[in-house]
UniProtKB/Swiss-Prot annotation:
GO terms for biological process: proteolysis. It comes from Arabidopsis thaliana (Mouse-ear cress). Belongs to the peptidase S10 family. One of its GO terms (molecular function) is serine-type carboxypeptidase activity. The gene is SCPL26. It is found in: Secreted. This is Serine carboxypeptidase-like 26. PROSITE patterns: CARBOXYPEPT_SER_HIS, CARBOXYPEPT_SER_SER. Glycans are attached at N52, N138, N327. Keywords: Carboxypeptidase, Disulfide bond, Glycoprotein, Hydrolase, Protease, Secreted, Signal. It is an enzyme of class 3 (hydrolase).
Length: 452
């Protein structure tokens, strides 16, 4: 009898817990976004998770589930992180790359993304760290002291609490994805998730694109790409190599900064994120003026401002913020795609992610690295040098992969890692080549090489 009472009491506790979780979920449900198409079928949620009570740090998320026709209960969960550092996953990942909606030029209405990755997985976008997008801290100094370590630690706390709010995703296949400076965020968070071994988080691996991996090899590849594509002179190439290559991208020397400035002048008014794409002149000029203020000059361009005008209009709308349960504290500044303060004051940035790659490769996790081949900010050359430094055993030859009879890019499979390039894509691969990015993601989830 006592045992039955104990079991009944335990059942009541579980029932209460499930009811609380469901209530928290429903508070975050998005019923309608201003300007959305009439035929939206999938469920989506957004809101805040507090990651540090004493400092008042809370991170904003947006979950877009797979449509009912795709059986979302059977689909994995994928966390997407954008880099910068200091740039929003809502602005870039969700609104112009892999999310279900794109924003029209009027900044008020939305249209469907035919190659949205939520057709293949449930997508969780996180604005991180605090101070980015709608994520906030009640401790002002947090915005000036953000760095790699705290970003990873806060993201892990977010995940643990988010899985409590959405318990139906516990034990579901879980992956982490991202691009650019998320080449730090993704492996660092992956390392914590792997080492913590939380039974609720069924972590399987990660995928990163045009990723910052290793300062030395990234520098070598960056300067080589500029020179080989005729963007800089022989003299500037020489000066960059002797002044920058053995330094930190986060804390460059004055000589390195001077060489970077010379390279910038020689490159002229191009779009560095996609060197064959026409620029938007006003924003490019404003971006160039930021160069002298940042401490990591080769990453000074964080993300292309030419593509973020529409998102700035949309996500600053009070009606949109209300629908998304965003800006609930009344931030003293407008929502922006990238936070200048967070990016410029970045505190800690390890020189290399290669030791983490080695640890997670040895652990047997699925790891894919992809690169758009027209990006001159974090180009394919640096990525290839970094991967070569891992000294992995090749399992396939370097081969062209097929996209409807055309070369979609090139790939090579190694023991523990797959490298893929996307032909004709810039820094934000899904923005420039959405179909090819979709095929890439599908192959990653299926754990199959891209087709020859």
């Amino acid at each position: 009898m006592a045992r039955l009472l104990l079991l009944f009491f335990f059942f009541l506790i579980l029932l209460h817990y499930a009811s609380c979780s469901r209530h928290e979920q429903e508070k975050d449900r998005i019923f309608h976004l201003p300007g959305e198409p009439n035929d939206v079928s999938f469920s989506h949620f957004s809101g805040y998770i507090t990651v540090n009570e004493s400092a008042g740090r809370a991170l904003f998320y947006w979950l877009t589930e797979s449509p009912p026709s795709e059986n979302p209960e059977s689909k994995p969960l994928v966390l997407w992180l954008n880099g910068g550092p200091g740039c929003s996953s809502v602005a870039y990942g969700a609104a112009e790359e892999i999310g279900p909606f794109r924003i029209n030029p009027d900044g008020k209405t939305l249209y469907h993304n035919p190659y949205s990755w939520n057709k293949l997985a449930n997508l969780l976008f996180l604005e991180s760290p605090a101070g980015v997008g709608f994520s906030y801290s009640n401790t002002t100094s947090d915005l000036y002291t953000a760095g790699d370590q705290r970003t990873a630690e806060d993201a892990y706390v977010f995940l643990v609490k988010w899985f409590e709010r959405f318990p139906q995703y516990k034990h579901r296949e879980f992956y982490i994805a991202g691009e650019s400076y998320a080449g730090h965020y993704v492996p660092q968070l992956s390392q914590i998730v792997y080492e913590k071994r939380n039974p609720a988080i069924n972590f399987k691996g990660f995928i990163v694109g045009n990723a910052v991996i290793d300062d030395y090899h990234d520098y070598v590849g960056l300067f080589e790409y500029w020179w080989a594509h005729g963007l800089i002179s022989d003299l500037t190439y020489h000066n960059l190599r002797i002044t920058c290559e053995f330094g930190s991208s986060e804390h460059p020397s004055s000589k390195c900064t001077k060489a970077m400035e010379a390279a910038d002048l020689e490159q002229g008014n191009i779009d560095p994120y996609s060197i064959y794409t026409v620029t938007c002149k006003k924003e490019a000029a404003a971006l160039r003026s930021r160069f002298s203020r940042v401490r990591h000059p080769w990453m000074w361009r964080a993300y292309d401002p030419c593509t973020e005008k529409y998102s700035g209009m949309y996500f600053n709308s009070p009606e949109v913020q209300k629908a998304m349960h965003a800006n609930i504290t009344g931030l003293a500044y407008p929502w922006k795609g990238c936070s200048d303060i967070v990016g410029e004051k970045w505190a800690d940035s390890p020189l290399s992610m290669l030791p983490i790659y080695k640890e997670l490769i040895a652990a047997g996790l699925r790891i894919w690295v992809f690169s758009g081949d027209t990006d001159s900010v974090v180009p394919i050359t640096g990525t290839r040098y970094s991967i070569r430094a891992l000294k992995l055993q090749p399992l396939s030859k370097w081969y062209p992969w097929n996209d409807d009879g055309q070369v979609g890019g090139w790939s090579q499979v190694y023991k523990g890692l797959t490298l893929v390039t996307i032909h004709g894509a810039g820094h934000e691969v899904p923005l420039f080549r959405p179909r090819r990015a979709f095929l890439l993601f599908q192959s990653f989830l299926d754990n199959k090489p891209l087709p020859m």
